[in-house]
């Protein structure tokens, strides 16, 4: 007992099939459920890939194995060496009869949370015991799809010639001149947790990298307490040289479309576990201008003036009209960050876009200002001091190419892919205004 010794897993649960009749296997995992019925015991073993049934008939196993099986408790960690026996009446067309069972660790009882999903629990209770919560097949399915999404994105960027980079998360000032920053003590100075890699991405365009991406944490000291906001999030950021905002949107369409196709192909069992109506979007998404979006909101009774950022009610009205994935383009310049390039024919609007899914914004991007003088003027016009951006601005004095890019929220994108209503379902250990543990 409690010793793995020389045993090593030969198969995960989903790899065992009826055609393996008579074959010996070694399985490892947790006791999902146990039933002892006289001279027969049924054990459902759960591992990362699913559930598998083991039958322990007293007349076919030695007495020690049978008695050990009866003493197992829920969530005990075990390994078994047994034989696959084809059986048409069994759930998957086969059973495994253990020849030997080893208990690697016992679980305390009662459990503070039921991983079998038979006893429902509120999300805060589940997050407090996240290590148990993520044993649930549906929760594991969410994070397997998330993993597949990130894998797909890296694959697409690699195929398109992007370089993966890592930018600092300890910064001296705000990226966008805002106040949504977490201050920290940095030796004799004050520093902040990075809210965006934006300025660093642009500096790399001056360095001649042409196309870069980063997948990393961002931190925002927003006091929102909603189902779609977190204070620590994963952002998928990219920047490209010698392109405009339309090229950036096309790249975003390709990244998102490829995610859907890769998930459908590689994660069918997780799609089934979550009972998703998984539809692959078209390769290009519908586009509406900000002005058109405002008209839609007003037509549905939402009070909004041109030039205002979209309210929650406006987003809901527009999302109900559009449905699915779509872009909102040609935003009012005053609503976007200082580095966003105004339209050459009408400086009241700029070359910015948001990618929406129904009422949820999942990505924001734009073509950037690449001329030094224009950027300095725009910073000053916004009431900020250009001296605060000295190292950033210097990159624009020595040959900055035209460039554009975007940031895609990995957590919100996971919400869409897995049809979750709360972003906390899509983050292993979420950080919001109230939650700093576990």
Curated annotation (Swiss-Prot):
Gene3D superfamilies linked: Bira Bifunctional Protein, Domain 2 (3.30.930.10), Nucleic acid-binding proteins (2.40.50.140)
Q: Where does L-aspartate bind?
A: 176, 220, 364, 368
Q: Which UniProt keywords apply?
A: Aminoacyl-tRNA synthetase, ATP-binding, Cytoplasm, Ligase, Magnesium, Metal-binding, Nucleotide-binding, Protein biosynthesis
Respond yes or no to whether keyword DNA-binding is given for this record.
Answer: no
Coiled-coil region(s): none
Q: What is its main location?
A: cytoplasm
The enzyme's E.C. designation? 6.1.1.23
The biological process GO terms on file are: aspartyl-tRNA aminoacylation
What cofactor does this one take?
Mg(2+)
Q: Which residues bind ATP?
A: 220-222, 228-230, 361, 409-412
The keyword Ligase is annotated on this UniProt entry: yes
**GO MF annotations for this entry?**
aspartate-tRNA ligase activity; aspartate-tRNA(Asn) ligase activity; ATP binding; magnesium ion binding; RNA binding
Q: Where does Mg(2+) 3 bind?
A: 361
Q: Which reaction does it catalyse?
A: tRNA(Asx) + L-aspartate + ATP = L-aspartyl-tRNA(Asx) + AMP + diphosphate
- Site Important for tRNA non-discrimination — annotated at 91
Domain of life of the source: Archaea
What is the protein's quaternary organization?
Answer: Homodimer.
The entry's function note states: Aspartyl-tRNA synthetase with relaxed tRNA specificity since it is able to aspartylate not only its cognate tRNA(Asp) but also tRNA(Asn). Reaction proceeds in two steps: L-aspartate is first activated by ATP to form Asp-AMP and then transferred to the acceptor end of tRNA(Asp/Asn).
Its name, as the record gives it, is Aspartate--tRNA(Asp/Asn) ligase
Name the source organism.
Methanococcus vannielii (strain ATCC 35089 / DSM 1224 / JCM 13029 / OCM 148 / SB)
